[in-house]
């Protein structure tokens, strides 16, 4: 009887993931269902909470981050059914009707929860809110949303000159703004648009490049009056708005699919079908880069579900080649850069990633961590101020590596370990549950 390829070991309330590829080689075949899109799940819960009437959400991500969002909005008066089934019911309380909570709102590890919620809290006059998060979130920059909100008249206080949580918010009647964001960030854009829902007049956000547009699509579906100018990367909300509850079907998260897209590309003999993947054009940078690297990808059964394009994606093993990733495409694949770094390790030539300094202020410094941990396994990666330089292909060797409690690091290292010689131990692998609770189980099933 052969030993299992993927095993979990509990160590002092942490979980180590041990991956030991067979000496005869490994191939991955079969169908994969991925969890609901995290970005869309957050927004469905939030808009459902502030809409009039009932919102039904199907396919919601049941990970830790949406639980944090639901918990916060329950504390402010919204009724949200338990996040343990495929059908979640949200009974909204209407725009401007969030109640002052009796305790601190805890966003957990979720930057999306904290940043988007700030736009709503700041626009609730005569109510006081305090927001915190875990140690990772308390170290992530919040000034990028606080500064534009303050320009609208918001009163927000925090550590390090109002840039770090915990944050205290005294709700105000805000003024409209035309904000030119220095970075392309869906969280910044969404925060300001959510604040603008309650403001008399036009609130506009202009970005230097296109960021993901899930908020715009969903706000329109819920009845908000939006104007979008794709030429100038501008979005305007006309307030005050009235939102009405909707039925939202959440597609699979392309950021979660990315791990299997790379695994199928780099593990010899692999042939995977990933079902029900959201292919919103503001998120498909991962597909464009993998195709540029020579990946064998086929989009099947393309369709639209509640305003979001969806497809099944087939990926087969191929010989990858290096490429350059920079400029306007980076905001469209920012969360996928850790797993693209893994792909680059096995690609012929030198892959250069630039304009990705945003990764230094995620759940971990993802540029530094991916360079350090993959180099530990034998990769040839040079860290740049805003990216990475990766020379391949190399043969990775099993090692002891750490997720730094960052879900995307944990899963990226697990995929790298599939193509390494000997055993790899990934410390604190339980972090994967933040966005993909079934990741380790799916990995075990594929490797049987």
From Swiss-Prot:
3-phosphoshikimate binds at residues 38-39, 43, 185, 187, 335, 362. GO terms for biological process: amino acid biosynthetic process; aromatic amino acid family biosynthetic process; chorismate biosynthetic process. Its EC number is 2.5.1.19. The keyword Transferase applies. Its main location: cytoplasm. It catalyses: 3-phosphoshikimate + phosphoenolpyruvate = 5-O-(1-carboxyvinyl)-3-phosphoshikimate + phosphate. Phosphoenolpyruvate binds at residues 38, 111, 140, 187, 366, 408. Keywords: Amino-acid biosynthesis, Aromatic amino acid biosynthesis, Cytoplasm, Transferase. GO terms for cellular component: cytoplasm. InterPro entries: Enolpyruvate_Tfrase_dom, Enolpyruvate_Tfrase_sf, EPSP_synthase, EPSP_synthase_CS, RNA3'P_cycl/enolpyr_Trfase_a/b. Pathway: Metabolic intermediate biosynthesis; chorismate biosynthesis; chorismate from D-erythrose 4-phosphate and phosphoenolpyruvate: step 6/7. It is found in: Cytoplasm. Pfam families: EPSP_synthase. GO terms for molecular function: 3-phosphoshikimate 1-carboxyvinyltransferase activity. The active site is at 335 (proton acceptor). Catalyzes the transfer of the enolpyruvyl moiety of phosphoenolpyruvate (PEP) to the 5-hydroxyl of shikimate-3-phosphate (S3P) to produce enolpyruvyl shikimate-3-phosphate and inorganic phosphate. PANTHER family: AROM/DEHYDROQUINATE SYNTHASE, PENTAFUNCTIONAL AROM POLYPEPTIDE. Monomer. Belongs to the EPSP synthase family. This is 3-phosphoshikimate 1-carboxyvinyltransferase. It comes from Gloeothece citriformis (strain PCC 7424) (Cyanothece sp. (strain PCC 7424)). The gene is aroA.
């Amino acid at each position: 009887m052969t030993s299992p390829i993927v095993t979990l070991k509990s160590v002092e309330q942490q979980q180590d993931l041990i991956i030991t590829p067979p000496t005869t080689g490994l191939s991955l075949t079969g169908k994969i269902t991925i969890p609901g899109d995290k970005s869309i799940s957050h927004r469905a819960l939030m808009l459902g909470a502030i809409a009039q009437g009932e919102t039904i959400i199907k396919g919601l991500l049941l990970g830790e981050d949406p639980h944090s969002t639901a918990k916060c909005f329950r504390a402010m008066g919204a009724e949200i059914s338990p996040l343990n089934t495929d059908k979640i019911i949200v009974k909204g309380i209407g725009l401007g009707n969030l109640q002052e909570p009796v305790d601190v709102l805890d966003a957990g590890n979720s930057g999306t929860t904290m940043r988007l919620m700030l736009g709503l809290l700041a626009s609730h006059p005569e109510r006081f809110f305090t927001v915190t998060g875990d140690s990772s979130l308390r170290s992530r920059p919040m000034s990028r949303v606080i500064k534009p909100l303050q320009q609208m008249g918001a009163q927000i206080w925090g550590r390090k000159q109002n840039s770090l949580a915990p944050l205290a918010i005294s709700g105000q009647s805000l003024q409209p703004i035309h904000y030119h964001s220095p970075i392309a960030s869906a969280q910044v854009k969404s925060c300001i648009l959510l604040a603008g829902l309650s403001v008399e007049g036009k609130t506009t956000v202009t970005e230097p490049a296109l960021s993901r547009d899930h908020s715009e699509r969903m706000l329109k579906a819920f009845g908000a009056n939006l104007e979008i100018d794709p030429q100038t990367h501008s979005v305007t909300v006309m307030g005050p708005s009235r939102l009405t509850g909707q039925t939202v079907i959440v597609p699979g998260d392309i950021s979660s699919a990315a791990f299997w897209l790379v695994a199928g590309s780099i593990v010899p003999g692999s042939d995977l079908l990933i079902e029900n993947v959201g292919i919103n054009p503001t998120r498909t940078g991962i597909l464009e880069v993998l195709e540029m690297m020579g990946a064998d990808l086929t989009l099947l059964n393309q369709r639209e579900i509640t305003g979001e394009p969806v497809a099944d994606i087939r990926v087969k093993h191929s010989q990858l080649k290096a490429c350059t990733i920079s400029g306007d495409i980076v905001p469209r694949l920012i969360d996928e850069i850790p797993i693209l770094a893994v792909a680059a390790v096995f690609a012929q030539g030198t892959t250069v990633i630039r304009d990705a300094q945003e990764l230094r202020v995620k759940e971990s410094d993802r540029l530094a961590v991916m360079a350090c941990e993959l180099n530990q396994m034998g990769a040839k990666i040079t860290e740049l101020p805003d990216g990475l330089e990766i020379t391949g292909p190399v043969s990775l060797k099993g090692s002891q590596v750490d997720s730094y409690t960052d879900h995307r690091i944990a899963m990226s290292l697990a995929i790298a370990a599939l193509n390494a010689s000997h055993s790899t131990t990934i410390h604190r692998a339980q972090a994967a549950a933040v966005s993909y609770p079934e990741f380790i189980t799916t990995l075990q099933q594929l490797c049987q």
